[in-house]
From Swiss-Prot, chains A, B:
Highly expressed in the root elongation zone and at lower levels in leaves and grains. Its main location: endoplasmic reticulum. Residues 22-165 form the N-acetyltransferase domain. The gene is GNA1. Transmembrane segments: none annotated. It comes from Oryza sativa subsp. japonica (Rice). It catalyses: D-glucosamine 6-phosphate + acetyl-CoA = N-acetyl-D-glucosamine 6-phosphate + CoA + H(+). Disruption phenotype: Short roots, disruption of microtubules and shrinkage of cells in the root elongation zone. This is Glucosamine 6-phosphate N-acetyltransferase 1. Belongs to the acetyltransferase family. GNA1 subfamily. It is an enzyme of class 2 (transferase). GO terms for molecular function: glucosamine 6-phosphate N-acetyltransferase activity.
């Protein structure tokens, strides 16, 4: 098995250098056995997802094509997933049938934080939305994370309100 | 032509009383000639939409079925549109493949404000999201509108950030 890169090199590689320690790629069905559900649980603790339910949702999202993209960061050495995020493209009538990218569910494994992985995933999601013709991308986050998203190029805009059933 | 209801009665009717002054219903193709584009322009001023572009986007959204609903409020007396709003249903993996409703592009014609129309449209969009199995509905708004959405049952949650291309 390839020797894991020493931390400093991992940091450089995580920042997108050559010989990447982490590969950012679209979610795959097999990711259910590479730690995807564990990542989700760090984002929003909930009872485990069955493989069947995962597969069904995976296929529903695949049917939406490029309008809904889930990206993951795979540790090149272990094959385990270290981060994930999603973007969905909303089709509007305003702005001459404009499109808006909604970034959702960004999570970095607690053991892999501080290596720029979250920023790499978010930037890839933003580029995907740009490529889909969106005029903007939005993200809702806690006040503690506004600094992180400012680093990714976002600015504070509005208030997010929620209604729970 | 039916005599327009006196203002007080219009207010009562707008609040969903009998003999409704406004009917809340899904967007129709013919709404391009009932003031839909003028409403959008009040929401986000932009060059007029061609009928062809409107039709193409209408059909794209129709293909998403109940996961993307645009509602309008039609003045029963004139057939003109007085309000509009949309909700899109996001399919997630978290929360055991949970769904979230995103309320977007709520607008009430300047001449029809103060009659509870906006609240009626928002409540119908919320009910649609509930019916689609969403565990919550979210909306992004300016600080000035948080009171309105609180009246509709929303609570302040997070910060919305944006990145414009």
């Amino acid at each position: 098995m390839e020797q894991p890169l020493p931390t400093a090199a991992a940091e450089a590689a995580a920042a997108g250098g050559d010989g990447e320690a982490y590969r950012i790629r679209p979610l795959e069905l097999a990711d259910i056995s590479r730690g995807f559900l564990g990542l989700l649980n760090q984002l929003s603790p909930s009872p485990p997802l069955t493989e069947e339910a995962f597969r069904a949702r995976f296929e529903e999202l695949a049917a939406l094509g490029a309008d809904h993209l889930v990206l993951v960061a795979e540790d090149a050495a272990t094959g385990r997933l270290a981060a994930a995020g999603a973007v969905l493209v909303e089709r509007k009538f305003i702005r001459r049938c404009g499109r808006v990218g909604h970034v959702e569910d960004v999570v970095v494994d607690a053991a892999a934080r501080g290596r720029g992985l979250g920023e790499r995933v978010v930037r890839r999601l933003v580029e995907h939305a740009r490529g889909r013709g969106c005029y903007k991308v939005i993200i809702n986050c806690t006040p503690e994370l506004t600094g992180f998203y400012a680093k990714c190029g976002f600015v504070e805009k509005n208030v997010q309100m929620g209604l729970y059933f």
